[in-house]
Amino acid sequence: MLSKEAMKAKKKYSKLGSIISWLVVHPKKIKMWKVKLQRLNFNLIGKINPKSDGASKEELTLGGIRTWKITTPNSDPEKILLYYHGGAYQVGSPEGYYPMLTHLARETGFTIYIPDYRLAPEHYYPAQVEDGVKTFEALINELGYSPGQIAFGGDSAGGNMSLVTLLKLKDKGKSLPSAVFCISPWADPAATGESYNDEMCSKDLLLGPIF
């Protein structure tokens, strides 16, 4: 029979072993842990950054996709902006973008919808664009807005999503939004444009398009 000291030591090292086992993950899972940490950090932005006074949010479902509706006292219920968030199609969420979009709603007078579209690596492209199309069409078919009332756009990957969603709608002969905008769009994911190399070699690195 083990002594009290031995039992205590066994219990202590058993806990340590459990912690070590939890930390050691398969190489294929390491990237996923990194992505989850990035998502957590992104969402913290929504809790830290200041929001516009009087802003409010409502969670609903559009085309089966969790979506936030963001308004301020300046928001016109007849002027709709569908915002696709950035994040390299891997991170980003309504939670993380909420502060920024409250200010955008205040300054533009739009009522903003931001979908929590599917992300990689759990969902391969073009799942993201499919969600972009679904949310736009749901604004029309489920909430009764006319295409002329709706503009959509986004930043980075959201800018790419805006352009591709527009092309998908056009190719299918679907209704189009009244306007589309892109903020620093990730328009060349494969980095095939000459400007990437030319800018990086001939100018200050921080002025190149990669930044």
PLM feature spans:
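Alpha/beta-hydrolase superfamily serine-hydrolase fold, recognizing
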Residues: K11, E58-F211
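A glycine/proline-hinged amphipathic helix-loop "lid/cap" segment
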Residues: M1-P73
